[in-house]
């Protein structure tokens, strides 16, 4: 991977891996999260896969396209309080109810409670981080890893996991936030990297 980045001319900067849809947390953001003692896994991708929980949580501060369609409301409308939904399935993109999480054996209540506490704490931390930069955190998605009988956040965030808006953003950024179109991903990656610098 390192040789590939040298050949392609991609910067060695720790903010982004532009070849994939992954986001290596910027040192500034990582340090900010660490101040709150939030457990984020430092393990390798292979270790994460073997110990990864079979669900992800998405904490929303504003309505995304899925929620707006379900609630027949406006996309990006702020919520009064953050809400969450559970994502599972092949690509971790299918919404399922909590009861199915247990009845299908994907998780147990203790795991889910620990994961949801971490997700909400991560959301609060990131909201504050981005608010200081004049931005709004629309939503954050997080996966989880079981390490030494503890649940920790999977630190391998993707750009699509952290959705941030800014009053001066371009129409293409807004389109990416609403529709998640792959052709607008490059603009969003640059936008997020600029905020994380």
What residues fall within each predicted segment?
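Active-site loop/lid in soluble adenylation, ligation, and acyl-transfer enzymes
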Residues: 1-88, 195-196
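Short histidine-centered catalytic/ligand-binding loop motif
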Residues: 19-20, 31, 35, 86-118
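A short glycine-rich, hydrophobically flanked beta-strand micro-motif that places a catalytic Asp/Glu
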Residues: 40-44, 128-147
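A short beta-strand motif that forms the metal-chelation/ATP-contact edge
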Residues: 52-55, 141-169
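A long amphipathic alpha-helix within ATP-dependent nucleotide-binding catalytic cores
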Residues: 107-138
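C-terminal helix-cap and adjacent tail motif
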Residues: 157-197
């Amino acid at each position: 991977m390192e040789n590939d980045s040298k050949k392609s001319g991609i910067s060695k900067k720790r903010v982004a891996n532009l070849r994939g849809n992954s986001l290596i947390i910027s040192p500034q953001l990582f340090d900010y999260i660490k101040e709150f003692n939030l457990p984020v896994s430092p393990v390798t991708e292979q270790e994460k896969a073997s110990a990864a929980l079979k669900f992800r949580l998405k904490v929303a501060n504003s309505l995304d396209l899925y929620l707006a369609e379900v609630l027949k409301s406006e996309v990006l409308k702020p919520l009064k309080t953050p809400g969450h939904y559970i994502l599972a399935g092949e690509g971790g993109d299918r919404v399922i109810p909590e009861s199915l999480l247990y009845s299908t054996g994907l998780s147990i209540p203790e795991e889910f409670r620990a994961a949801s506490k971490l997700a909400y704490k991560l959301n609060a931390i990131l909201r504050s981080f981005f608010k200081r930069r004049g931005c709004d955190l629309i939503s954050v998605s997080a996966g989880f890893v079981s390490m030494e009988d503890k649940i920790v956040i999977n630190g391998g965030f993707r750009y699509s996991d952290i959705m941030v808006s800014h009053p001066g953003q371009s129409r293409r950024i807004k389109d990416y936030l609403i529709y998640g179109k792959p052709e607008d991903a490059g603009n969003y990656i640059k936008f997020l990297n600029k905020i994380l610098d």
